[in-house]
Regions:
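Charged/polar, low-hydrophobicity segments characteristic of intrinsically disordered regions
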Residues: 45, 49-54, 114-117
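Alpha-helical bundle segments that constitute or directly flank the non-heme di-iron/ferroxidase center
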Residues: 1-25, 79-84, 96
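Extended, helix-rich structural scaffolds rather than catalytic motifs
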Residues: 62-168
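Alpha-helical membrane segments in multi-pass integral membrane proteins
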Residues: 8-16, 32-49
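Inter-helical turn/loop segments and adjacent helix faces that build the functional surface
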Residues: 20-37, 51-67, 94-102
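Aromatic-enriched hydrophobic runs in primary sequence
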Residues: 18-19, 26, 47-48, 120, ...
């Protein structure tokens, strides 16, 4: 189950954020269509994890749930921090906090984080991994606001199976 949490939620969430970012900025219509198909496929992977883990997590002890909740939180912290090349900041003698703030205010990092955590956080909430113990940590991380977004477990399989609409 830790592999599913890591892969189906965090890694696939990173992939979805990356592909959605690329789709939003590319002027190439063919690449946009290809990215649309990739995003649909990645969404299926996330949905599988949500649907499976929702039932699995329900049957764990409170201690086991907390372990998984902390694992997911730590993975989110790592995912958020990977957007900032702090080793580069240090190499050039830049203040890490100032460089991180500048990078965040430049737009790309904050938009990528929004795309990532607007998928990951509601999914973690749906499967019961936003526990009372980790909820304040997510709040401090600045991503708890995404809890009310739609989780991926409700994705329409019929919609995902439709062929690409080329008229748009």
């Amino acid at each position: 189950d830790l592999k599913l949490i890591g892969m189906q939620f965090i890694i696939e969430g990173l992939a979805l954020a990356a592909f959605n970012t690329a789709k939003a900025v590319t002027p190439d219509p063919v690449l946009k269509d290809i990215l649309h198909l990739i995003i649909r496929d990645e969404a299926r992977h996330v949905t599988f994890g949500v649907n499976y883990l929702e039932d699995f997590i329900e049957n764990l002890s409170d201690e086991e749930k907390e372990d998984r909740a902390m694992f997911a939180y730590e993975a989110c912290v790592i995912s958020k921090e990977r957007l900032f090349p702090t080793d580069v900041f240090r190499k050039f003698g830049w203040d890490e906090d100032e460089a991180r703030e500048f990078s965040n205010n430049a737009g790309f990092a904050s938009e990528f984080q929004r795309l990532l955590f607007s998928r990951v956080v509601p999914n973690l909430s749906r499967i019961g991994l936003l526990t009372d113990k980790v909820r304040p940590l997510y709040d401090k991380l600045g991503v708890l606001e995404f809890e009310s977004h739609d989780p991926d477990g409700d994705i329409s399989w019929a919609e995902l199976e439709k062929p690409l609409d080329l008229s748009a």
